[in-house]
Structures are given as C-alpha cells and as structure tokens.
C-alpha cells in the first residue's frame, strides 16, 4: 500500500508538469492554429538558461528562475515573429513543417552548445526529502509541482476572468 501511495504522489507531481506543458500547447494551437513541435525545446532552453545563470554565472536560483522563463518567452516570441507571422493563413501542413524545422534547429543548436551531456544545477532546497507518513517527496519536485499548480491556476483565472481571456476564448471558438 505504501508503494501505491508513493506512485500516486509521483504521478500527481509529474502530471502537474505535463498539464502545464499541455496547456501551453493547447493555447498555442487554439489561438494560432499551429502545432508547436518546438514547445519541448523551449522548455529545454529555459532549463539550459537556468544552468547558465546558476552554475556558470553564479546567479541566485530565485533570481535566475524568472530570467530563464523570460528568455524562453522571448525565444518563443522571436520564433513567432520570424517564422510564423509571415505564414498566417498558410495551411496546417506548411506551419507543421516550419515548426518541425524549428524543433530540429533548436535541438541541434542546444546539443552543439551544451554538448548533449546531462546538466544539473545546485538546488536551493534541502537534500533530505519531505516525509509524509509512509511517502516522501523531494523538495525540488514539490517546488516544481507547486509552481505548476500556481501557473495552472493563474492561467485559469486569466482565461475565465479577464478581457484578454474572453478574447482568447472567442479566438478558440472561431
């Protein structure tokens, strides 16, 4: 029974991250009608930026986190401006090929830049896990889960309670 509870907790934590990624893909497809194959590479780019800021440049983890997110958003905006804006109205096959090309280009650029060897950053969290009865969770994973839940909640509020969200919903239904 303890193993089952541990697996359920692990699945919930991983599911929170996947849900956040899925919401991003859904928003991009719903608004822009683009299947963003490079979405995962933007996520990886943010992770590499965290490595750069924390391990190479020595920036504080909590300062580096929003900077890495901002750089990822800026790269996504640049991709939209350079690759997709000119293709508005193009059929889905064309935009899919463009995004597959972007995915391959980003993946290979990151591999050339970072050598394809797994990187890790120093954690600001305790190394001993949080123990809740018979289950345990690392503080890193708990942090990721809480941030994912907060961002999912913020996305829900934006989509359902703001003018921007109303415009987004109208675009989805168009």
Spans of features found by a protein language model:
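Small-residue-rich transmembrane alpha-helical segments that form helix-helix packing/gating elements
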Residues: 1-32, 37-172
């Amino acid at each position: 029974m303890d193993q089952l509870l541990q697996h359920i907790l692990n699945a919930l934590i991983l599911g929170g991250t996947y849900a956040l990624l899925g919401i991003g893909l859904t928003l991009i497809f719903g608004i822009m009608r683009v299947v963003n194959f490079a979405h995962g590479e933007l996520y990886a780019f943010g992770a590499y930026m965290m490595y750069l800021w924390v391990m190479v440049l020595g920036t504080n983890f909590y300062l580096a986190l929003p900077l890495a997110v901002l750089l990822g958003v800026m790269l996504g905006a640049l991709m939209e401006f350079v690759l997709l804006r000119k293709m508005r109205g193009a059929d889905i096959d064309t935009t899919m090929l463009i995004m597959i090309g972007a995915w391959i280009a980003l993946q290979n650029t990151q591999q050339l830049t970072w050598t394809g060897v797994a990187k890790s950053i120093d954690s600001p969290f305790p190394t001993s896990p949080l123990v809740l009865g018979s289950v345990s969770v690392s503080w890193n994973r708990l942090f990721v889960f809480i941030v994912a839940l907060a961002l999912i909640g913020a996305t829900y509020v934006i989509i359902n309670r703001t003018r921007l969200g109303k415009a987004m919903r109208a675009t989805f239904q168009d």
